[in-house]
Amino acid sequence: MPAIIDQDGIGGMQTSIFESGAILLYLSGKTGKYIPSDMKRQVLVWEWLMWQMAGFGPMLGQVHHFNHYAPVKIDYAIERYMNEASRLYGVLDTQLSKGDYVTGDDYTIADMAILPWTKSYARQGIDIAKFPNIARWRETLHNRKAVQKAYEIEAEIEAEMGEKNKTDLRELSGEEWQKLFGTTKPK
């Protein structure tokens, strides 16, 4: 679970925040960065952040689970989540046809929240060529120095984790499986 502790938080006190959307809202509110100052545009950013938190992220998580980790292949679940993933990519592509970034001409926390979920589009079974606005947006964001730095840090962490960074979750121990999925590991 993503979490931060701001040593100089609310009222100058240590403040802990968990969940990525809450962290992004907190940091943008505190710094005034990556969120518009006028309420109308701010609400648009909130809407797209919530779209990612409640729809895009969870549905793509289900695609990954049923395609790659479920001990039994369930055709209905695979088809249902693949169709929903494709639909959501279409929604995002349509939105991105209106501007350089998710909510228009400015890079915001909505872009920050959505981009990582598109990293594994091929593994999600998505043909990115069918979504040209997403492809353009991804390229634009990948050219940002901060995004490049984030991916460098991710690669460093993965390298440090070595064997612990298991790409096939079926290789997890029973205890690791229980912590991740909340159930006993299937035989």
Q: What is each of the regions a protein language model found here?
A:
Residues 1-83, 93, 178-187:
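GST-like domain detector, emphasizing the conserved glutathione-binding G-site
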Residues 16, 38-41, 107, 127-128, ...:
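Alpha-helical interaction segments
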Residues 20, 49-51, 137, 151, ...:
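N-terminal, helix-rich and Lys/Arg-enriched segments in bacterial and organellar proteins
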Residues 22, 145-146:
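Alpha-helix/helix-capping structural signal
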Residues 43, 137, 157-158:
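Short secondary-structure capping/turn micro-motifs that flank functional sites
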Residues 48-145, 152, 187:
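GST-like fold's C-terminal all-alpha helical module
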Residues 154-187:
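Acidic/histidine-enriched, glycine/proline-rich intrinsically disordered or flexible terminal extensions
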